[in-house]
Design a protein with these regions (language model features):
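Charge-rich, well-structured scaffold segments of protease-associated domains
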Residues: 1-60, 78, 95, 104, ...
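His/Glu-based metal-binding/catalytic segments typifying zinc-dependent metallopeptidases
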Residues: 58-118
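Phosphate-proximal small/polar/acidic motifs at interfaces that engage nucleotide phosphates
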Residues: 121-122
Length: 270
């Protein structure tokens, strides 16, 4: 649920209904189906249930293009809470899903923190046992995106977690990943993509997202070729371009002030 307790509590049924009628309209929607589906029967059902709201020949609104906006400079946010763990999230802005190096960015994310063989998992958890959880995430939208790193650890290990995390990010920004890491990351991306297609719901979601995001169907073969074409040189160029920037950060845990947070974290935010 997005919003504060106050904003949610004053929300009315009429407001929700008005929002639904204005936003959930045929020109904003795609109906996708996968499995043993009769196409003509599906079209008939859509016409039956949407009826007069359908506009003949009108396609969904074209995906938005342009450069995303970020309000203000990267900042550090602290939520002081009496908790057993410290949670930290670091993030940097990236280009959107239409970027020409989009798949190199996905390979970078996977090699950095996208699995058990990733650099962060190996250095922070496997080798040193500093954190319960550590991983990266990549969110791509029409006009911008975000590459983030999350970790959860005991408060007394927070400084060590940030020291190792900062070292990993600086190392990848400076020296890049290895050919072997690139190959493992590409294999992980390909494997996850193909395994996901074994589920009809995933196939359906992929069809709908492709139509909404790109205005056309992108085959699995097309995506696999794009991943395969990524080189370690391209990945490392993306790493130099993005990972040398200042980060935004959010911390939740038993910490009284920003001054009490690890110096490595404050230096990364700048």
């Amino acid at each position: 649920m997005i919003g504060s307790a106050q904003s949610v509590s004053v929300m009315t049924r009429a407001q929700l209904q008005s929002f639904h009628l204005r936003r959930y309209t045929p020109e904003r929607m795609v109906v996708a189906a996968a499995g043993n589906v009769d196409h003509d029967g599906l079209v008939a059902l859509v016409r039956e249930h949407f009826g007069s709201r359908l506009v003949r020949g009108r396609r969904p609104v074209a995906p938005r293009k342009g450069t995303g906006r970020v309000n203000g400079s990267p900042r550090l946010t602290l939520v002081s809470r009496d908790a057993e763990q410290t949670h930290v999230s670091l993030g940097i802005r990236t280009p959107g899903r239409g970027w020409e190096h989009r798949w190199a960015l996905s390979v970078l994310h996977t090699a950095l923190g996208g699995g058990l063989s990733s650099r962060l998992f190996q250095e922070v958890r496997e080798t040193r046992g500093l954190a319960y959880s550590v991983y990266s995430a990549l969110d791509l939208f029409a006009d911008s995106g975000a590459l983030s790193v999350y970790a959860a650890c005991l408060p007394e290990r927070f400084a060590d977690v940030m020291r190792v995390t900062a070292d990993v990010l600086e190392s990848v920004a400076r020296d890049g990943i290895t050919e072997a890491e690139c190959g493992i990351a590409k294999g992980s991306l390909r494997g996850g993509l193909v395994l996901g297609l074994e589920d009809s719901s995933s196939r359906m979601s992929r069809l709908g997202r492709s139509e909404l995001n790109y205005g056309k169907h992108r085959s699995i073969e097309h995506t696999l070729r794009q991943i395969e074409q990524v080189t370690v040189e391209e990945v490392n160029a993306v790493a130099r371009h993005l990972l040398s920037r200042r980060y935004g950060a959010a911390v939740l845990g038993p910490h009284g002030s920003k001054r009490s947070l690890p110096q490595q974290l404050r230096a990364m935010v700048g």
